[in-house]
């Protein structure tokens, strides 16, 4: 999983907002459903994982049931549970969110599922160091004709923080 902060920035949704939490839940619900569905389809062909019988999933109990989280009604969870009870799932473990630093840099998005750590920072890799800058902030500031050398220098002087740069409107803070 990578680029959650990018997706939220592209939708102009603040990372720590209630709306961001809803989007995050929908994304992970979709990933969980798709992984269960595909694992069940593979189990139809190759059989369930060796210790499936007796597992919570074999009884129609999925992760959200164990955490008392109510899924949305976007998917037919009851049907999927029945299919899983009938056919099993091929994988005992389905999703493993982990850091994705190198590939995220290659693909040009924020690593993992975390917020953007700073608007400007130095990234150190085996081949050297390079500056990483929040392109979404630059785009926003350019849209209001505020991206210039003065703002760039203040951003650097403030270690990537815009909180104390008076010229930048609060909506971007």
Where do the model's predicted regions map?
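Long, C-terminal-biased catalytic regions of enzyme "large/alpha" subunits
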Residues: 1-173
């Amino acid at each position: 999983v990578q680029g959650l902060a990018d997706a939220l920035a592209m939708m102009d949704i603040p990372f720590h907002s209630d709306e961001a939490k809803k989007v995050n839940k929908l994304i992970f619900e979709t990933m969980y459903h798709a992984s269960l569905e595909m694992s069940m389809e593979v189990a139809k062909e190759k059989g369930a994982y060796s210790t499936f019988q007796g597992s919570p999933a074999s009884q129609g109990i999925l992760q959200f049931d164990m955490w008392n989280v109510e899924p949305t009604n976007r998917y037919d969870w009851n049907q999927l549970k029945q299919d899983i009870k009938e056919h099993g799932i091929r994988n005992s473990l389905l999703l493993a969110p982990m850091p994705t630093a190198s590939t995220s840099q290659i693909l040009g998005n924020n690593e993992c599922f975390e917020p953007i750590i700073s608007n400007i920072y130095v990234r150190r890799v085996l081949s050297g160091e390079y500056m990483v800058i929040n392109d979404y902030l630059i785009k926003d500031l350019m849209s209001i004709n505020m991206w210039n050398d003065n703002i760039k220098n203040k951003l650097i002087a403030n270690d990537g923080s815009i909180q104390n740069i008076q010229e930048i409107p609060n909506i971007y803070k």
